[in-house]
Amino acid sequence: GRTMKNGGIMTSRPFRSPHHTISDVALVGGGSYPQPGEISLSHNGVLFLDELPEFKRGVLEVLRQPLEDREVTISRAKFTVTYPSSFMLVASMNPSPSGYFNDPDAPVTSSPAEMQRYLSKISGPLLDRIDIHVEVTPVPFEKLSEERKGEPSNVIRERVTGARKVQSERFLEFSNIHYNAQMGVKQIRSYCKLDESSLQLLKTAMEKLNLSARAYDRILKVSRTI
């Protein structure tokens, strides 16, 4: 992350939310004298990309390798610089340009051509690197106006902290692995063993949904976390 103007060490994890007009250099880093980009400034924190399809496709594509390697290397004629970029990518988007896709009560819909242009900005390989996809449906007025109490943040924090502690203990012998998302193939085989029924369920999902080998590993990592 970036320290405050008055200096001092950081005491909380960074949260970066760049505008969709950002350039690829500003996102991953670079320049004549390379400077870290947003993906390095969000190292060990969260990189939030709001309205994902509004980013230029070329800008989004440069995320693919850093997401895989958790670092980014910038090469220039006389030197090469490597910056860390182990961040949690969180992105949001509307389901269509109008925002009302598949809503029978919506006054506006998008044509198939508009949908194709909109969704084509996000490539399959990039989506394949996002572990969890959640579709959020419209909330009716009755539920919005209800007086409901959600789960307190401190309770959620305790649960997350407990899960992270379990993972830290699990990977105590590894210097470069601290949580499930960082597992390599060997660790996945060791810590994500499936029984026969689970294996058959995963096999069926892989075949019916035409999932990739990368998706297979990520499903196991998320399952281990849950």
Predicted feature residues:
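Solvent-exposed alpha-helices and their adjacent loops that cap or buttress functional pockets
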Residues: H19-H20, I39-L41, V81-Y83, L126
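Walker B catalytic acidic pair
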Residues: N44, D50-L52, V62-L63
